[in-house]
Structure formats: structure tokens, C-alpha cells
Swiss-Prot record:
Free-text function comment from the UniProt entry: Transports acetate.
Keyword Cell cycle listed: no
Name of protein: Cation/acetate symporter ActP
Family classification: Belongs to the sodium:solute symporter (SSF) (TC 2.A.21) family.
Main subcellular location: membrane
Alphabetic keyword roster: Cell inner membrane, Cell membrane, Ion transport, Membrane, Sodium, Sodium transport, Symport, Transmembrane, Transmembrane helix, Transport
Subcellular location: Cell inner membrane
GO cellular component, one term: plasma membrane
Organism, scientific name: Citrobacter koseri (strain ATCC BAA-895 / CDC 4225-83 / SGSC4696)
Record GO terms (molecular function): acetate transmembrane transporter activity; glycolate transmembrane transporter activity; symporter activity
Membrane topology of this protein: Multi-pass membrane protein
Keyword Nuclease: no
Amino acid sequence: MKRVLTALAATLPFAANAADAISGAVERQPTNWQAIVMFLIFVVFTLGITYWASKRVRSRSDYYTAGGNITGFQNGLAIAGDYMSAASFLGISALVFTSGYDGLIYSLGFLVGWPIILFLIAERLRNLGRYTFADVASYRLKQGPIRILSACGSLVVVALYLIAQMVGAGKLIELLFGLNYHIAVVLVGVLMMMYVLFGGMLATTWVQIIKAVLLLFGASFMAFMVMKHVGFSFNNLFTEAMAVHPKGSAIMSPGGLVNDPISALSLGLGLMFGTAGLPHILMRFFTVSDAREARKSVFYATGFMGYFYILTFIIGFGAIMLVGANPEYKDAAGALIGGNNMAAVHLANAVGGNLFLGFISAVAFATILAVVAGLTLAGASAVSHDLYANVFRKGATEREELRVSKITVLVLGVIAIILGVLFENQNIAFMVGLAFAIAASCNFPIILLSMYWSKLTTRGAMMGGWLGLVTAVVLMVLGPTIWVQILGHEKAIFPYEYPALFSISVAFIGIWFFSATDNSAEGNREREQFRAQFIRSQTGYGVEQGRAH
């Protein structure tokens, strides 16, 4: 089961190769000057965009949502840039490299949550909200309690992701660039703060768009060169891969990674519903002018991501053929230099030489920056908009709210750097699974039921949401990953790797039970207000658009 965890941690889309994704002792590579030069070009260009964006950020709306003036196509690219991480690129191609067909199952598994967002969430979310998903959840429920719960759910997810990203960034850069781990972590943290602090959502959006274009171009070129090598025949690709892989034809069969159906189902539900509860993804739907553009955003994003995950499958099989069979990329013991997660990087060298290797290495670093910038902005908005402006200091001016948001960015950045350094040698793979479980168990049920269930009340949302969050955390702690591997106990109290199946069930049952038994006057008033909310969610009547958004 440890092998399962290692493989899954490598594929979780925001882990950015944290923890087991780069397993064992990290072999520091020689300083890659091509990669460093290309990355510096990217940094200078994106800092120029940040300067340009800073001149256009004049209001709260500009800072949180780029004024609502991002088009559906641009937002689709940015969402793809936010979601496709270094772990998607290196981790899934490594999974295909080691296990073959199973890698395709996992890569496509990440797309399962997007139809839910497209058909159930995107349109209503945009029509009901302004800056954060808490705007939607609290539309007819009590502002204070719901915003506190939503902000806590968001901040926990953001914190877990940021730690995983920072550790992953340090390890990855140590591998690819030959830079010191601590320097890498500080560099990522400082750049992240600069993008968000000065450029807000506009700069973050364009960093994500540029990163998505670079990643799609790099992956497309690699897949093209692999297919060119086999005469553009998938039959030749698979035949040659089977001929050189140690497992032979077994790499074309599914089921080699997950033997426990409960864990597989729990992981699948966590990924599917967790995607629809990630605060930095949901926040992107408020950057477009209306619900139509929000739908288009998901349509384009799903297309870009689907294309990308197909490319990773080709890249993985190409690595089996061109890297796995080439002793040049092996160490004295016969293992891949730098570990299996370097398969795609070695393939870049095999198909494009040292210059293209530098390009792919720089893109991997840019990928991490784009993801952490989105996470930081989501965390800052949860504090400044949900907690400060709507709970603790009602009636705060836009200027005060923006000041709190920027202070939060600095605090989050410093904390992320410190924790990134402290967790250098820790197994933090569980944090990614826990982040998905919390997003699926706390954020998603409240968002979905607040929009679709007329009988939902504040009491039900609060009890069910907190129960889901606490259950996810407790079961994760009592499970094999933390209880046995980290805390050193002999046997896990909770036998499964991932808690989502159980914590999601607890959340939905809790919300239903405590809402159904709520006979208070406040509860009845909230039920009566559902019709007005439903009309607004369907028609967008009263929603602020464009620059007035």
C-alpha cells in the first residue's frame, strides 16, 4: 500500500512533486545554466506583467477578480494553469513510466470533477457570488457563522497546499537546477508575494496563462517527437514500450496500483468533489463578466487539461522507450538518475537536447509559481473579505480591506517559507490528500446544498460542515499514513489511506439532519428566501458585471 501512496502522492495535481513525488535522498544535479537563464527570462517577463497590472489595480474588484474583465477563453487557460501542476507533468508521466496503463486512469481521474463544476456549479456560483465562494454559501444564511466556516475551510486547504508546494518546489529545483533547497524555497516565496501583493488577480491570471501556454507547448513538442520516433503509430509506441519495459505486456493492463476498492473509491470521491471545493479554483469564476463566460471558462479549461493529460500518457510511454532503455540516464545501480519522477525531464533531453531540457526545467519552476500565487490570493481574500470585512469589521472601507489583504499575503508568504524550510525532510504527501478531503467534505457540500436544497438552514450547514472538516482530519490522523508511517505506531486505528468516502457522507448526513430538525423562526425565514436566491442564480438578475462587478 505504501507503493500506492507514493504513486498517488506523485499524481495529486497540486502536490508539485512534494514528499514521495521525489522520493528518497535527492540527488542534487549539476547547475543547469540554460534552465536558470530561461527561468530568469520568465521571471523578468512576469514581473513586468505584475508592474503593468499594478497600474490597473485601483479597487477591491480589480484586486480580487481583475475587475471581472477576463474573457472565458483567457479564464479557461488560467484555470488550466492553476490546475496543471509540476506533479501532473512529472508525476503522472512517471506513473506511466513505471506502471503503464494505470497512469492513464489516474490522469483522466483528475478530469472527473470538472463536469460537476460545469453543469452544477459554475453558472450559479457566478450569478450569486462576488469575490469568494462564501458569498454564495452565505447568500440566504447567517453571514457570520457561514463565513467563518468557509474561511476556515479555505485557509486549511490553502495552508496544506502551500506547505506541499514549498517543499516540492525546493526539492524539484534542487534536482533540476542544482540550486540549494533553502534558496529555492525563499525564491519561490518572494516571487509569489510580489505577484499577488502588487498585481492581484490580474497579474496572477496572466502568470497562470503564460505558464499554461508554455507547459502545453513543451508537452506537445515532447509528444510530437515521441510519435515521430515511432512513425506516428500508437501500435508501434506500445509494442516498443512493452519490448523494453521490465513488466512486458503487463504495462497494458489496469489494476496494478490499487488493490483495496474502498481506498480507491475514497480517493476517487476526494479528487472528484475536492476539485469542486478548492477555493483558488472557485475564485476564478468571479473574474469573468457573467455566467455564460463562466461556463465557457470550464469548457475551455476541461479541453486544455484533457489534451494535456493525454500528452502525459504519450510522454510516459516515450520515456519507457527512449529513457528506460538508455543506460546514459541510469546510475551505477541501474536506477533512473534523480528518481522515476525525472523520467519526463530526461525525455526532454533525449528528444530536444540540453536547450530543451533547460526550457522544460524552467517551465516546471514556472508551474509552481503560478499555483502558489493562486493559493495565496485565495487565502488572503478569505481573511480580508470573509473574516475582516464581513465578520469582524463590518462596514470596512475598500482601502482598509485591501490593506488587510496585502498584510495577509505577506504573512502567508513568510509562514510558507518558514514551514517549507522546517518540513524539508518530512513526508508531507498526506497534506495533499487531506486538502482534497477537506475541500470535498466541508466546502463542496455547503456550496452545492446552499444552491440546490431549499430546506438548508444555517444550523445544518454549520453542523454538517464542521463535522465533515473534523472527520476528515481525525480519520487522516488515525489512518496508515500519519498514525503508522509518521507517528510510528504499529497498526492504524482507521484502516484506509483516504477518508473522503466517510467524511463526505458524515458532512451530507449532518447537513440534512440538522437542517431537517431546525424548526426555528430563523430557519423558516432562510427556507423562504430560497426562491429569490433560485431566481437570481438562474437569471443573474441583480448581479454586478464587468468593471462594476
